[in-house]
């Protein structure tokens, strides 16, 4: 098969492009490429991409990836000459990611990682496109020892537990990606992403930092569903987006961890948020929820070696940017009455 011509810019497909990570990725890709954003808004949000809709190099397609996608037949993509140029790169991020809703959308989560991943891989095969899959540290399960997770660790997972639809879904998707890559000689990359945070995170999906910030801005108790000595790691969104782009540009194919290896006490994160918001909130500890899990640490040696990547944004700086964006969210009751500049 002859290589399709590339006109003035590459055509890039981003599934889950209206989500927290996907929308930030689209912001960067649109600077040099034509971007096709796919989402069905199960956990993505339209306001994440509103600012991109008038850009002539951006096109949003509302579609459930568990259904086949015949991209070349979409009339709205004629301007990208997809029928002639095809798609050069695919970033597959689409997966419902809302810990508080795992028990509400388990089948949707499993199908996105199985049927959905297969459908997008078929597009990659048809277009001979480079393929990047955003996996998760969840495939490792809970740590059995203090050592950071390396890519060659197989994981300790409960296949029928409260988080199984997400954890096992990601594990199956990784297997699908790797086997498609081998069978069809595709260039595939898998990024196992550890905790990340930043502007545009949903305020209601059960993630720790948005929950803490929302509580602090409303003056409510900050509830920590873990022991007082519990720790975790957090990577700011701009560092994560840089890692994703470096991975796609690199010659590296395979699996790589992406995360911040700095281990932080959760209570210290809560106290920092209270300080930055000038909140009167108090910290209370509660019994862990069913969908919560003990977090492991990332070993990012391979990311440093193969991608030349490591996180550079300090937690405090990332929290300030996240809080500034969340203060503008109308869904957070009472924020407009707080004086943050005193």
Where are these regions (language model features)?
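N-terminal Rossmann-like NAD(P)+-binding domain of SDR-like oxidoreductases, especially those catalyzing
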Residues: 1-196, 238, 325, 329, ...
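C-terminal substrate-binding subdomain of Rossmann-fold SDR/epimerase-dehydratase oxidoreductases
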Residues: 4-5, 27, 63-66, 119, ...
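Short, conserved catalytic or interaction motifs in soluble domains
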Residues: 43, 199, 260
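Short alpha-helical
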Residues: 44, 97, 203, 264-265, ...
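Residue-level signature of the cytosolic catalytic core of signaling kinases
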Residues: 54, 145, 161, 201-205, ...
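Nucleotide-sugar-dependent glycosyltransferase donor-binding/catalytic pocket residues
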Residues: 67, 110, 201-202, 233
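Amphipathic alpha-helical segments in well-structured domains
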Residues: 117, 209-210
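Hydrophobic alpha-helix immediately C-terminal to the catalytic Tyr-X-X-X-Lys motif of short-chain
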Residues: 172, 176, 180, 212, ...
């Amino acid at each position: 098969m002859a290589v399709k011509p590339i006109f003035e810019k590459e055509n890039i497909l981003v599934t889950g492009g209206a989500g927290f990570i996907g929308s930030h990725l689209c912001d960067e890709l649109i600077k040099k490429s034509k971007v096709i954003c796919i989402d069905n808004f199960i956990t993505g949000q339209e306001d994440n991409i509103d600012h991109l809709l008038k850009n002539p190099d951006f096109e949003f397609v509302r579609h459930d990836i568990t259904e086949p996608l015949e991209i070349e037949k979409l009339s709205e993509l004629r301007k990208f000459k997809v029928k002639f140029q095809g798609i050069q790169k695919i970033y597959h991020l689409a997966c419902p990611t809302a810990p508080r809703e795992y028990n509400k959308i388990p089948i949707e989560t499993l199908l996105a990682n199985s049927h959905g991943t297969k459908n997008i891989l078929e597009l990659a095969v048809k277009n001979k496109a480079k393929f990047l899959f955003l996996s998760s540290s969840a495939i490792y399960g809970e740590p059995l020892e203090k050592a950071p997770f390396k890519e060659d660790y197989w994981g300790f997972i409960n296949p029928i537990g409260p988080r199984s639809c997400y954890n096992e879904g990601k594990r199956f998707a990784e297997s699908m990606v790797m086997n498609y890559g081998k069978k069809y000689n595709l260039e595939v990359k898998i990024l196992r992403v550890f905790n990340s945070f930043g502007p545009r995170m949903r305020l209601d999906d059960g993630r720790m930092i948005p929950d803490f910030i929302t509580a602090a801005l409303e003056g409510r108790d900050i509830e920590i569903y873990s022991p007082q000595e519990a720790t975790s790691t957090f990577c700011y969104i701009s560092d994560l987006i840089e890692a994703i782009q470096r991975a796609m540009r690199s010659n590296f194919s395979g699996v790589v961890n992406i995360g911040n290896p700095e281990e932080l006490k959760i209570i210290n994160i809560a106290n920092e948020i209270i300080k930055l918001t000038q909140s009167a909130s108090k910290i209370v500890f509660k019994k862990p929820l069913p969908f919560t899990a003990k977090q492991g640490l990332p070993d990012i040696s391979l990311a440093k070696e193969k991608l030349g990547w490591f996180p550079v944004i300090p937690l405090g700086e990332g929290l300030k940017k996240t809080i500034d964006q969340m203060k503008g969210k109308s869904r957070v009751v009472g924020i407009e009455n707080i004086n943050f500049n005193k």
